[in-house]
């Protein structure tokens, strides 16, 4: 009889015990902080895409400059060429106009349940249509944005079969993660280098992030920007996705005088207008 009572007590204890919180599970907090929370939903006037927070530091005046990396094709419709009258030339000339876009973050409870979102306007401060990259800067200068994605260190190799995680706002949904492996390297598409992964993405993931975990540094690092989905006829092949390598991202940032983002001093000889580049903090 006593044995039965003990067994019944054990079963009751199991039934009424509180479930383990996701926050108590090893790795949940790190995955959210270093991957999910660094990726935002980017909303131009039409459509949507993804972006990754790569920098948020103050300048000498104490204003924060927060930068979001995305694809050019995500914000392409916000860049317009309009004819405007030039009084000095006495004629109409084509001038570029860049409309603001919105960046949207999502807030989670217990690392699982979305409880809300927040957004901020952002300006397009740089882009390269050929590389299909663009850089956004938040209008809000009062607050630091955290967390910020880690970059894969320069010259560190990546290999086929490396496990990777793609994070993006597919179909305009809040950013979510998919897993896969690096599958093919050094694919030239429209003259630029891409690599293939099997982490599924879909329309709206463009401009997001592809991460790989570093056992050495014990952190998730940005290795590429998911940009293209393979297709067979009109059918998207979502598990064959092409990403822009992080080395191309570095070249893009350097070429637009954002050297501090890649942990380098500003090249003042190359960037004659370095004093106007607020994001340098110099």
For every predicted segment, state its role.
Residues 1-5:
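Positively charged n-region of N-terminal signal peptides that target proteins for export
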Residues 6-17:
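Bacterial N-terminal signal peptides
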Residues 22-63, 67-71, 78-80, 132-133, ...:
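N-terminal activation segment of mature serine protease catalytic domains
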Residues 24-30, 79-110, 222-282:
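C-terminal cap/linker of serine protease catalytic domains
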Residues 38-39, 65-71, 157-171, 197, ...:
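Active-site-proximal beta-strands of protease catalytic cores
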Residues 48, 61-84, 99-160, 164-167, ...:
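Conserved active-site neighborhood of the chymotrypsin/trypsin-like protease fold
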Residues 51-53, 122-124, 182:
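Conserved hydrophobic positions within beta-strands
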Residues 57-65, 112-115, 189-191, 214-221, ...:
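Short, solvent-exposed loop/turn segments that connect beta-strands within catalytic domains
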